Regions:
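FIC/Doc superfamily catalytic core
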Residues: 1-274
Length: 274
């Protein structure tokens, strides 16, 4: 794990000094939100070309949660959540340091963005949007292992919220464990995995592991969904080796995301993202 951390630190340091981020870091973050949404949508079974999403973003017509295209609606919801994350990121050049949401607000807000289109389309009840799963609520999303219910769910959710907010924790380990808990515990009836990947982006930026906010950490899960599922099952096993394997998978996913960030920075600098 030490070698994985060192490799990640080296890659993120190189990204931090990419020439495109000197003046065009805002554009790079916008493009990262597009690529993250497209990759995450692919993981969720909602394939949408990046060019299509960019076109809608440029036209500023994603204000309504539903369209005639369910896949676009799903990806647009993830994009809205990613755009919200960008608003919480500190400036790369400047002194702006936005106030950070509480853990509970973070999860509920991202979940509203992600699942809002489902509720608008009548796929899920409005009462399930942004609300923790209750005993009587159905679980509409699969995942590794059996998700806890009732008191067992509350017993896992409270420590998860504390983990998100606890000061001084290693950034990689925090991001990986929070990601693993969200897809294992599944605190919402749906949208848990998409929210989990968004939270990873938030945490690694907030904690300074990848401060540019341009890494496309969803890319690896989209490229190798089998490896993602296998690593999630390893985490859900609860063994020390399984948790280690999951953290190493998260490190690899972030490395792939940083590589994609270097590519998008080149595209931003060349003006070829459209």
């Amino acid at each position: 794990m030490v070698r994985a951390q060192e490799a990640l630190d080296e890659a993120t340091a190189a990204l931090r000094w990419n020439e495109a981020l000197r003046r065009r870091w805002r554009e790079a973050r916008v493009e990262a939100s597009v690529r993250c949404a497209v990759a995450s949508g692919a993981v969720e079974g909602a394939p949408v070309p990046a060019s299509l999403l960019r076109g809608h973003v440029a036209a500023a017509d994603l204000t309504r949660p539903t369209s005639a295209d369910p896949a676009l609606d799903a990806v647009a919801g993830i994009w809205r959540a990613g755009t919200r994350l960008v608003a919480w990121m500190p400036d790369l050049r400047g002194d702006l340091r936005p106030a950070q949401p509480s853990a509970r607000t973070l999860l509920a807000t991202l979940h509203r963005d992600v699942t809002g289109p489902l509720a608008s389309a009548g796929v899920i009840p409005l009462g399930e949007v942004g609300a923790p799963r209750e005993e009587a609520m159905p679980l509409r999303e699969g995942g590794p292992g059996d998700a806890p219910r009732g008191g067992a769910l509350a017993a896992r959710l409270d420590p998860l919220l504390e983990l998100i907010e606890a000061p001084g924790l290693p950034a990689l380990v925090r991001a990986a464990v929070v990601h693993g808990e969200l897809i294992t515990v599944r605190p919402f009836t749906s949208g848990n995995a998409a929210v989990a990947r968004l939270v990873v982006r938030h945490l690694v930026t907030r904690d300074g592991l990848e401060p540019t906010g341009t890494a496309v950490a969803d890319q690896y899960a989209a490229q190798a969904p089998g490896a993602y599922s296998a690593a999630a099952r390893a985490y859900a096993s609860g063994t020390s080796q399984g948790v280690t394997d999951w953290i190493l998978w998260q490190a690899e996913a972030l490395l792939v995301g940083v590589t994609e960030a270097q590519a998008l920075c080149r595209a931003v600098q060349a003006g070829t993202t459209a």
